[in-house]
Swiss-Prot record:
Source organism phylogeny: Eukaryota, Metazoa, Chordata, Craniata, Vertebrata
BP GO terms, sorted: detection of chemical stimulus involved in sensory perception of bitter taste; G protein-coupled receptor signaling pathway; lipid catabolic process; phosphatidylinositol metabolic process; phosphatidylinositol-mediated signaling; phospholipase C-activating G protein-coupled receptor signaling pathway; phospholipid metabolic process; release of sequestered calcium ion into cytosol
Natural source organism: Homo sapiens (Human)
One cellular component term from this protein's GO annotations in UniProt: cytosol
Protein name in the entry: 1-phosphatidylinositol 4,5-bisphosphate phosphodiesterase beta-2
Positions annotated to bind Ca(2+): 328, 357, 359, 408
PI-PLC X-box domain sequence ranges: 312-463
InterPro entries with a match to the protein in the record: C2_dom, C2_domain_sf, EF-hand-dom_pair, PI-PLC_fam, PLC-beta, PLC-beta2_cat, PLC-beta_C, PLC-beta_C_sf
Length: 1185
């Protein structure tokens, strides 16, 4: 048990660090070099240096971010300092003596402390050992007693010239309430004047603890103490303390055999350690003050300390881990303006990040050095080489596991890309992975190597060429011009990408998919996508040198989940903006999770986040996305959660996903609101009791408690009331616990506890994964916004975690856990109920004969626990409800939403048909007007035909003539006939084109309508089906409750009847036990049967629901088929319809010709003789032609 045996021990400070070493501290700004003695205090809390004037400067170990030596340390720039250190002499050994300590409150605001030792290689030893203290898990996650001890150590180190502790230092250390500090000093019989001083010998640790108890009394702990100590005695025995530890400080879910409860002899060691009175300790007694320090000790850490260490299996494929990832790593401020810095790569990697981004752009002449910057913005540039050197220096200081360099490559120069590749090879050396591992070839179906396989390696993520043909850009200076496209490989000379055959075909498929997808987007959507993606969509082609460095992380454009599953290439990765990823997650969450089981995805902020703000990473962790990249320079809530979560597992930057999110045979829906298979949900209860030293001012404060997890988790945020007074030293909140009833997947959830000042000013917070929390009373030491531990502020809380149990099963669980206690309580309730109701109605006890035989000493078993009784309970439970039914297809089609949509669609189609008919009529009218202008054969000028009276006729007559429409004066009948035929042909062609366009438009609109209607029906069907499943479960729960009530009534009746049969108390107790045991068996059987019934009904209902959904899909196919058949039929009859319309038009325009010249010799074939003579003649001429 960790309470008795802490997993982690405090860091040990090497003797030479505490003894000190002589250095020269220099500063480039002041050009001052001063001799100092550099030391670390024996407990490893502070790095400090003393000047010759005895002046002392402190650096909290928790504020140190890095230590550097040799060529990576800072170098003096001023000539004055360079002369002091003889740096310009050829045999100078300056690099062997350098030491730089980097500190700061966050990754951007940094201070560099520069030292030079008198001896060689001293700086290296100091850099390594000080950094080891900084990276120790307990440095940032120490117990409350450790942080309080830090205050004492600092007070005793900050002495005046007389070697005493100035009282003013107490006022500076505890500034919230000066009067309370003075009163606490007086209570310890110490001077309290501002100009007074205290002898360090008069202020040992016991006096310091008494001072703290006076300054910050703990009445809330006294209340806990009085509830467990011996009555009327001011101490707690070791037996009482053992009971307290086992009941309150121990996780009730632990197995008693694997994790045995504490014993009194083990607890004695805790009393010896924390009880201030030696006499009490010898007697095995703990005082209230000892209880306070016990609850502040490392044994009561709120964290499960083993979770801080590397405890995950690191031999799984790379895509089975969440990977700490950064976006636009080089930026120190916003995305549009601000400084870029290579130092950010160091700081991000030191924080445990394992994926950094490099936006590479072409360098300018004459040097043509590639640069890193945010393209098309006002951010500054840094050299690519400088960034690579920073990465090489800090790559594996925090974690030995692989680093991924995510290149956004805009360098369109083969020469500069070759230079980039050369820098990577020479600076990274053996750290760079240039070839795939033998066990993990780049083939479909082969998983990625594990973090352990890639330990100490750097992987490149950059576009990879489809073919790697021979290039000479890096060798031939007179070769290819910059900005030109890469040379295409001659047929038969190129090598297929990643050793796969048919890749060219696959790439063509991808391109076709992309073209098809982009073809469906309008201009505004394309612009929006480009603004969301930023410059990521403008990457250039990779040339051979850079392409050859890419292996296991090959980026490609995402097509679809089905396409990725078909290709099954684990080494292919796709990047998504947060908006695109959210869209995919909301539409196909299960497929997204399955995709991440097979290969990797990277999510990055949308391009419109110009202030470098972040999105919440939790939603994408829920989908199993590995690289959820954030802006590390912005310490907002998403970044705070990211830093807190990746602090665990040895700060390795890799967190193994839950088994359910890795197994291909399991499906996981992150939006599930029900139980997740093989995962036990957790109920978390947190009581915020009090706070200590929350602010440097006297203010009112409140606490927020928030849960990050799956969308289906319970209420996410609670808040206490404001503290009753402006007391920030020890406020107490007397409120009910905050309960998160059903945390579906505890491994994915985190708890945030934040303290805010009145006016919503942030004071401190802590974010801890649910599975890293310990149950019991704990002091929660707060952290800053940048996740740095705060020395003073803390909260005292009570945490209780247990397995989630549905309300319907709560009584049964209690009964099974402790049946005697449960039924005793029920008997007490029954007696009280009987007294209140005036006694239960008397009923004959049905089992009198067996009971009598038992009283007389017979051994025949009673029927209470007989199989017959249990069978009766089963039969009662077997009374199945009516066959579960689901909404039919007809009912779904009659739903209001579907009917309303159908009416809208019908209206749209009617309007479309009207527009088509109007266009058709306009064409006929225009054709008729042109024909009318020709007039009868042999007559020129205006025609004799009127198509309609009034405005319509005027409008038609005012239509513009075509040059060929009118007959020339004196033109003969043959000329007019030729022009009639020409106009007729043109009109037919226009009508055919109009008809085809109209029918195609109608078809597309019908297909769209079908898709919308089916989508609506599917949506409503799923809503209905979810409601049906919920109703089925509720009905089952109600039936179970009713059955339990009936069985409870039967149990009470049996007990009542038994008391009338016998007065022998021993026999009554025995029979009562048997009745209770029988009752428990019956309840178990009933619940088991009811559960089976529910599962059976649920299975039947789901089958029916699935069949209904399949009917909807079939209906979609049928509708599409009908629409297509109608389209084909109308297209088939279009030509005849056009000819008929044109003939009707000709008849209308030349009625006189049809009447006056029927006797004229017909030149047409016999089959056309019955037609209008003029039309027949025109048709005949057309057929001859």
């Amino acid at each position: 048990m960790s309470l008795l045996n802490p997993v982690l021990l405090p860091p040990k400070v090497k003797a030479y660090l505490s003894q000190g070493e002589r250095f020269i501290k220099w500063d480039d700004e002041t050009t001052v070099a001063s001799p100092v003695i550099l030391r670390v205090d024996p407990k490893g809390y502070y790095l400090y240096w003393t000047y010759q004037s005895k002046e002392m400067e402190f650096l909290d170990i928790t504020s140190i971010r890095d230590t550097r030596f040799g060529k990576f340390a800072k170098m003096p720039k001023s000539q004055k300092l360079r002369d002091v250190f003889n740096m310009d002499f050829p045999d100078n050994s300056f690099l062997l003596k350098t030491l730089t300590v980097v500190s700061g409150p966050d990754m951007v605001d940094l201070t560099f402390h520069n030292f030079v030792s008198y001896k060689e290689n001293v700086g290296k030893a100091w850099a390594e050992d000080v950094l080891a203290l900084v990276k120790h898990p307990l440095t940032a996650n120490a117990s409350r007693s450790t942080f309080l001890d830090k205050i004492l150590v600092k007070l005793k180190m900050q002495l005046n010239s007389e070697g005493k502790i100035p009282v003013k230092n107490f006022f500076q250390m505890f500034p919230a309430d000066r009067k309370r500090v003075e009163a606490a000093l007086s209570a310890c019989h110490l001077p309290k004047g501002k100009n007074d001083a205290i002898n360090p010998e008069d202020f040992p640790e016991p006096v310091y603890k008494s001072f703290l108890m006076s300054l910050c009394p703990r009445p809330e702990i006294d209340e806990i103490f009085t509830s467990y100590h011996a009555k009327a005695k001011p101490y707690m025995t070791k037996e009482h303390l053992t009971k307290f530890i086992n009941q309150k400080q121990r996780d009730s879910r632990l197995n008693s055999l694997l994790f045995p409860p504490a014993r009194p002899d083990q607890v004695q060691g805790l009393i010896d350690k924390y009880e201030p009175s030696g006499i009490n300790a010898q007697r095995g007694q703990l005082s209230p003050e000892g209880m306070v320090w016990f609850l502040c000790g490392p044994e009561n850490s709120v964290l499960a300390q083993d979770k801080l260490l590397l405890h995950h299996d690191m031999t799984q494929p790379l895509n089975h881990y969440f990977i700490n990832s950064s976006h636009n790593t080089y930026l120190t401020a916003g995305q549009f303006s601000g400084l870029s810095s290579a130092e950010m790569y160091r700081q991000v990697l030191l924080s445990g990040c394992r994926c950094v981004e490099l936006d590479c752009w072409k360098g300018k002449p004459p040097d043509e050095e590639p640069i890193i910057t945010h393209g098309f913005t006002m951010t500054t540039d840094i050299f690519f080489k400088e960034a690579i050197e920073a990465i090489a220096e800090s790559a594996f200081k925090t974690s030995p596991y692989p680093i991924i360099l995510s290149f956004e490559n805009h360098v369109d120069s083969p020469r500069q890309q070759a230079k980039m590749a050369e820098y990577c090879r020479t600076i990274f050396g053996d750290m760079l992975l240039t070839e795939p591992l033998e066990k993990f070839p780049l083939k479909p179906g082969v998983p990625l190597p594990s973090p352990e396989d890639l330990r100490g390696k750097i992987l490149i993520k950059n576009k990879k060429n489809q073919f790697s043909g021979p290039t000479s850009s890096s060798k031939d200076t007179g070769g290819e011009a910059e900005g030109s496209s890469p040379p295409s490989a001659p047929a038969g000379e190129g090598t297929v990408w990643a050793g796969e055959e048919g890749t060219e075909l696959e790439e063509e498929e991808v391109e076709e998919e992309e073209e098809e997808e982009s073809g469906n987007l309008d201009e505004e959507e394309i612009k929006k996508m480009q603004s969301d993606e930023g410059t990521a969509g403008l990457e250039v082609t990779a040339y051979e040198e850079m392409s050859s460095l890419v292996n296991y992380i090959q980026p490609t454009k995402f097509v679809s989940f089905e396409f990725s599953a078909q290709k099954n290439r684990s080494y292919v990765i796709s990047s998504f903006t947060e908006l695109k990823a959210y869209d995919l997650l909301s539409k196909a969450s299960v497929q997204f999770v399955d995709y991440n089981k097979r290969q990797m995805s990277r999510i990055y902020p949308k391009g419109t986040r110009m202030d470098s703000s972040n999105y919440m990473p939790q939603m994408f962790w829920n989908a199993g996305c590995q690289m959820v990249a954030l802006n590390f320079q912005t310490m907002d809530l998403p970044m705070q959660q990211n830093m807190a979560v990746f602090e665990f597992n040895g700060q390795s930057g890799y967190l193994l996903k839950h088994e359910f999110m890795r197994r291909p045979d399991k499906q996981f829906n992150p939006f599930s609101v029900d139980r997740i298979d093989v995962v036990v949900a957790t109920t978390l209860s947190i009581t915020v009791i009090s706070g200590q030293f929350l602010s440097e001012r006297s203010v009112r404060t409140y606490v927020e408690v928030e849960l990050f997890g799956l969308p289906g988790d319970p209420k996410r945020r609670y808040r206490t009331k404001l503290s009753p007074s402006t007391n920030s030293i020890n406020p107490v909140w007397k409120e009910e616990p905050f309960v998160f009833e059903k945390i579906l997947m505890p491994e994915l959830a985190s708890l945030r506890v934040a303290v805010m000042e009145e006016g919503n000013k942030f004071l401190g917070h802590r974010i801890i994964p649910i599975n890293a929390l310990n149950s019991g009373y704990h002091h929660l030491c707060l952290h800053s916004e940048s996740n740095m531990p705060l020395t003073m502020p803390a909260l005292f809380i009570f945490l209780e975690m247990k397995d989630y149990i549905p309300g319907a099963w709560a009584d049964l669980t209690v009964a099974l856990a402790n049946p005697i206690k449960f039924f005793s309580a029920h008997d007490t309730k029954s007696v009280k109920l009987k007294e209140a109701m005036g006694g239960l109605p008397e009923k004959p006890f049905p089992l009198a004969s067996p009971v009598a035989s038992q009283v007389n000493g017979a051994l025949a078993p009673t029927s209470n626990g007989s199989p017959a009784a249990r069978a009766g309970a089963r039969e009662e439970a077997m009374k199945e409800a009516a066959e579960p039914r689901t909404a039919s297809l007809e009912e779904l089609r009659e739903l209001k939403g579907v009917v309303k949509l159908q009416r809208r669609h019908e209206k749209e189609l009617r309007e479309l048909e009207r527009r088509g008919a109007r266009r058709w009529e306009e064409l006929l009218q225009r054709g008729a007007a042109q024909l009318a202008e020709l007039g009868p054969p042999g007559v020129g000028g205006v025609g004799a035909c009127k198509l309609g009276p009034g405005k319509g006729s005027r409008k038609k007559r005012s239509l513009p003539r075509e040059e060929s429409a009118g007959a020339a004066p004196g033109e003969g009948p043959e000329g007019v006939d030729g022009r009639v035929r020409e106009l007729k042909d043109r009109l037919e062609l226009e009508l055919l084109r109009q008809g085809e366009e109209q029918y195609e438009c109608v078809l597309k609109r019908k297909e769209q309508h079908v898709a919308e209607q089916i989508s609506k029906m599917m949506e409503l069907a799923r809503e209905k089906q979810a409601a049906e499943l919920k109703a089925l479960k509720e009905t089952s729960e109600n039936d179970t409750k009713e059955m339990k009530k009936k069985l409870e009534t039967k149990r009470l009746e049996r007990i009542q009847g038994m008391t009338k049969v016998t007065t022998d108390k021993m026999a009554q107790e025995r029979l009562k036990r048997e009745i209770n045991n029988s009752h428990i068996q019956e309840v178990v059987q009933v619940i088991k049967q009811m559960t089976e019934n529910l599962e059976r009904h649920q299975e039947k209902l789901e089958e029916k629901q699935a069949a209904c959904l399949e009917q909807i899909r079939e209906m979609e196919k049928q509708f599409q088929k009908e629409a297509l058949a109608e389209y084909e039929a109308r297209m088939k009859g279009l030509e005849a319809e056009v000819k008929e319309s044109v003939r009707a038009c000709l008849r209308t325009c030349f009625p006189s010709e049809a009447k006056d010249k029927p006797e004229r010799a017909c030149e047409c074939p016999p089959e056309l003789c019955e037609q209008d003579p003029l039309i027949a003649k025109a048709d005949a001429q057309e057929s001859r032609l």
